[in-house]
Amino acid sequence: MNNPLYQKNIISISDLSRAELELILTTAQSLKHNPQPELLKNKVIASCFFEASTRTRLSFATAVQRLGGTVIGFDNAGNTSLAQKGETLADSVKIIASYADAFFIRHPQEGAARLAAEFTNIPVINGGDGSNQHPTQTLLDLFTIYETQNRLDNLNIAFVGDLKYGRTVHSLAQALSLFNCNFYFIAPEALAMPDYILEELNEKGINYSVHSSIEEVVDSLDVLYMTRVQKERFDETEYQHIKSAFLLNADMLENVRENLKVLHPLPRVDEININVDKTPYAYYFQQAQNGIYARQALLALLLTNHFQDQA
């Protein structure tokens, strides 16, 4: 059976169908339980981070190396010809891509990954472009939800915090809309979910509602997806008010569903009290670890045409 993801660019989560998402998740599950240490032997993956990253960069490098591949690239664009000598992004991409079998890019500019894809004939993977998209984070989020809930369909999912600039919630809401989930958006008015996401949900007939506090909906949830409210976007007084309104404490989880899982793309700052860590609902550290398997699955499918026959 031909692999529909072979040599495909992954720029937006919207580039993937429900069937393709399910293929990635089953492949991730297979790789988590059945490692393939030589699957990417002799493959070279370019990893280019024009923006700071910890979890994405390290889990991606780990994913490649545990599949037997080699990583080239940089985590500080300030030391590259693009920054030091004025080379264009297009020229940088063309040259780096000529050394590799796939190109993973994180960039602060929205649309940078799609631009990169125009200048190379190898698969380009978007590792985050500005406040736009973060599709590989979405894949690990979906894998974690599937792993903990045993399904993706018809779940009650709340998104909390910075829903305007948080690229992780944009991608995840779009992906989960393929599975007819119910959404609860909890954010300060200045950081509400963008209109274009709401319009997409309306077009698909997806149920969603807007709330001012976690307590309003937490007892009805299957997944509580927390995000960081960015302090730099508010004055100190306003930030302190917002921070306290969107803080999750363990005592707020006393009457929740047994299957509830609290997720967070990390890093967390003030939005999840450490007393939540010891509850059975906290799953954000396992979620981060799942990034290895989700990214392994994506690489396996992009670079090996018949891997799904083994999954």
UniProtKB/Swiss-Prot annotation:
Tree of life domain = Bacteria
Q: What is annotated about its quaternary structure and interactions?
A: Heterododecamer (2C3:3R2) of six catalytic PyrB chains organized as two trimers (C3), and six regulatory PyrI chains organized as three dimers (R2).
Q: What name does UniProt use for this protein?
A: Aspartate carbamoyltransferase catalytic subunit
- Pfam hit, one: OTCace_N
Can you tell me which residues bind L-aspartate?
Answer: K85, R167, R228
Q: According to its UniProt entry, what is the function of this protein? A: Catalyzes the condensation of carbamoyl phosphate and aspartate to form carbamoyl aspartate and inorganic phosphate, the committed step in the de novo pyrimidine nucleotide biosynthesis pathway.
Q: Which InterPro entries match?
A: Asp/Orn_carbamoyltranf_P-bd (IPR006132), Asp/Orn_carbamoylTrfase (IPR006130), Asp/Orn_carbamoylTrfase_sf (IPR036901), Asp_carbamoyltransf (IPR002082), Asp_carbamoyltransf_Asp/Orn-bd (IPR006131)
GO cellular component terms listed in the entry, alphabetical order: cytosol
The encoding gene is pyrB
**Catalysis: reaction(s):** carbamoyl phosphate + L-aspartate = N-carbamoyl-L-aspartate + phosphate + H(+)
The record lists the organism as Psychromonas ingrahamii (strain DSM 17664 / CCUG 51855 / 37)
Give the GO biological process terms: 'de novo' pyrimidine nucleobase biosynthetic process; 'de novo' UMP biosynthetic process; amino acid metabolic process
Asked if Transferase is a keyword of the record, the answer is yes
Of which family is this protein a member? Belongs to the aspartate/ornithine carbamoyltransferase superfamily. ATCase family.
EC number(s) recorded for this UniProt protein: 2.1.3.2
